[in-house]
């Protein structure tokens, strides 16, 4: 979504939204809240990445369990395409996601920090490995269907460890990050984004 007459010269800022989990589709739809951004020259885009079901059930299965890395590389590819097509440029993209989409934000921050100017991570599920290993948490066992059971499956453990945002923070330059935590959120405990941001403050250069 962008204003008529947009010059595709890479100068426009972009807000790129993504989710990519649980087979949830994010259809293109009208929202008056986006018009304020578009009126100020933004390009607004939604990335239909694997893990969602925008292109059928197989699209979902290719973005869960041992295929989860596809979710993150798809989102990065969407951002790179927008830049290559001139809608925006590298370093002018702000990414937005919440809950499992917040995990997406944390993962792409580690994998491709220079692509993004900023990230908006709402109630972000970023301490994935620690949470999925704790079977005493009431919501953990049902989540094994989506992420795998790292307690019993070595491959699932290694896959989750490879992308869990908190565990993969390293010393590098990160984009600006706005993180929101929900004090009473029943799914994502508030300390996950809190400890993630604390670690980012320590390691970001």
Regions found by a protein language model. Give the residues of each.
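Active-site-proximal cap/loop segments of hydrolase catalytic domains
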Residues: 46-205
């Amino acid at each position: 979504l962008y204003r008529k007459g947009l010059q595709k010269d890479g100068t426009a800022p972009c807000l790129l939204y993504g989710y990519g989990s649980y087979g949830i589709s994010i259809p293109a739809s009208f929202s008056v809240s986006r018009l304020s951004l578009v009126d100020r020259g933004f390009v607004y885009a939604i990335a239909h990445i694997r893990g969602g079901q925008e292109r059928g059930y197989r699209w979902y299965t290719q973005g869960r369990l041992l295929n989860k890395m596809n979710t993150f590389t798809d989102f990065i590819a969407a951002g790179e395409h927008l830049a290559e097509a001139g809608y925006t440029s590298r370093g002018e993209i702000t990414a937005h996601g919440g809950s499992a989409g917040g995990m997406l934000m944390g993962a792409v921050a580690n994998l491709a920090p220079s692509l993004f100017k900023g990230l908006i991570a709402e109630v972000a599920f970023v301490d994935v490995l620690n949470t999925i290993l704790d079977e005493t948490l009431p919501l953990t066992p049902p989540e094994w269907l989506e992420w795998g059971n790292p307690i019993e499956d070595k491959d699932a453990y290694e896959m989750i460890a490879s992308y869990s945002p908190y565990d993969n923070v390293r010393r590098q330059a990160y984009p600006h990050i706005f993180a929101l935590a929900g004090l009473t959120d029943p799914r994502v405990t508030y300390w996950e984004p809190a400890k993630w941001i604390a670690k980012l403050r320590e390691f970001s250069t």
